[in-house]
Amino acid sequence: MNNQKLKYFKSPAEFFNLFLSLLLAMPLTRVTGFKKSIYPVFSEKIALAVSGVTNCAYCSWLHTKTSLEKGMREKEIKSLLDGDIKDIPEQEAPALFYVQHRADFDGGFSPKARQRIVDFYGEEKVGHIDFMFQAVYFGNLCSNTVYSGRYDMVQGRKDLKFRLVYFLSLPVAYFIRKGSK
């Protein structure tokens, strides 16, 4: 883990809002265009870009492993985790900048940034990119919440709100850690 501040859930409401938006977006993954627009290596690049911003140790490890399995080079993986997108293909760079922007804004985005990416990719593909972002970001926050709670990194971690969100995040963090082994 580097010295960046971990992003984690601060309340059960934040957890449930992101979880609900993820559930509502799930039907997008059944659309045939999803697999064409978000091919496996591109999805890993999105995951690495988001995990680099949230500084998630579990997810960085998992997505490094799966990226290597899908044929990505170590240098490219490290660059994405470090937030360096200069050597990314022109067709992928806007999406990766966009998901980094969203992770920096705690899942939000500026309307101008979203409009620029819609102009570049079209609304359907941006919907797919948004879904990928939400899935990865949710996993990152769950993992970081558990990590932060376990390693005494959160002031007020005995607070009822934090304890509740910690326990809500445990199953997701468990499956991410299990997947990275």
Language-model features: locations:
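Hydrophobic alpha-helical segments
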Residues: 1-181
